[in-house]
Amino acid sequence: MATGSRESSFSSCASSCDFDDEGVRGTCEDASLCKRFAVSIGHWHDPYIEHLVRQSKERKAPEINRGYFARVHGVSQLIKAFLRKTECRCQILNLGAGMDTTFWKLKDEGLLPNKYFEVDFPMIVTRKLHTIKNKPLLFRPIMELHPEDTLQIDSHMLDSKRYAIIGADLRDLSELEEKLKKCNMNTQLPTLLITECVLVYMTPEQSANLLKWAARSFETAMFINYEQVNMDDRFGQIMIENLRRRQCDLAGVETCKSLESQKERLLLNGWETASAVNMMELYSGLPRAEVNRIESLEFLDEMELLEQLMRHYCLCWATRGGQELGLKEITY
């Protein structure tokens, strides 16, 4: 939840585009380290992240750790609500997944969808696949669901019965669709698409095209988006300047003006319902016992900074179709 969040996905461009994307790719590393640290001090349970992400050499600030807790909790609640509504007869597309461990955690909980897809930069995918192949704790659960002799895996792609990891470019929708279909994406299944701090690194036109593609590709679908909001104020401008100093441009920041602008772009690009909440509101609505547990882990002397950070990130979700499943009823 820090001012430069995370995992984005666009790759095979010209060399100038690759240079522009370098800062964006770096946000994957930043977010992964923040999550690993928060897990290491007990904010949430994730036995897999330590096998994918090295431990940070520096301690992360308490407000950052609480922000990541709220992010992981909110996204997880929406994912599980979708899985319950569809009784897991669905598929999930995590676009810009980075070092995400959701596949393994859902398997442990008996909540795997028909198939779980991840898409990210080929460079990030290569690193993740190399780690998976060399860590039995990560590789074994995949093989338990798939006959070994038919597993497809190379440096940029893994395709198994229940899990696929794909290196692709979200700005090239024909390439994206082709690669997903090669891994048996089923457009007839209820589909959940997830982006976390991904759309903000695309131009408004590029992110609109992705949202339209998602809306028209699946009859029954839900879209979850986590990213910045309220970026017109002074605190938002400081966030933008900090990222620019790291060669990371928020190309889509104009869509992050308010919760209303976030919902509006979903509705304008083919989605039938749209909801949004800033992360301070979400955090404030957590069960008191859970908040007390989180706040007992570390002392925070500036509550105002936490509130400022939380008010500049939001969780949005949209649905299309699925009336018989009750998708419109889903909330965090």
UniProtKB/Swiss-Prot annotation:
Top enzyme class, one word, equals transferase
- SUPFAM superfamilies of this UniProt entry? S-adenosyl-L-methionine-dependent methyltransferases
The UniProt keyword set, sorted, is: Methyltransferase, S-adenosyl-L-methionine, Transferase
Q: Where are the transmembrane segments?
A: none
Q: What is its EC number?
A: 2.1.1.233
Superkingdom in the source lineage:
Eukaryota
Q: Name one GO biological process term.
A: negative regulation of protein-containing complex assembly
Q: Which InterPro entries match?
A: LCMT1, Ppm1/Ppm2/Tcmp, SAM-dependent_MTases_sf
Q: What's any one GO cellular component for it? A: cytosol
Task: State whether keyword DNA repair applies.
Answer: no
Q: What is this protein called?
A: Leucine carboxyl methyltransferase 1
Q: Does the keyword Methyltransferase apply?
A: yes
State where S-adenosyl-L-methionine binds: R71, G96, D120, D169, L170, E196
| GO molecular-function terms, A-Z | protein C-terminal carboxyl O-methyltransferase activity; protein C-terminal leucine carboxyl O-methyltransferase activity; protein methyltransferase activity
Q: What does this protein do?
A: Methylates the carboxyl group of the C-terminal leucine residue of protein phosphatase 2A catalytic subunits to form alpha-leucine ester residues.
Against Pfam families, the record matches this protein to: LCM (PF04072)
Q: What is the catalytic activity of this protein?
A: [phosphatase 2A protein]-C-terminal L-leucine + S-adenosyl-L-methionine = [phosphatase 2A protein]-C-terminal L-leucine methyl ester + S-adenosyl-L-homocysteine
State the family it belongs to.
Answer: Belongs to the methyltransferase superfamily. LCMT family.
What is this organism's lineage?
Eukaryota, Metazoa, Chordata, Craniata, Vertebrata
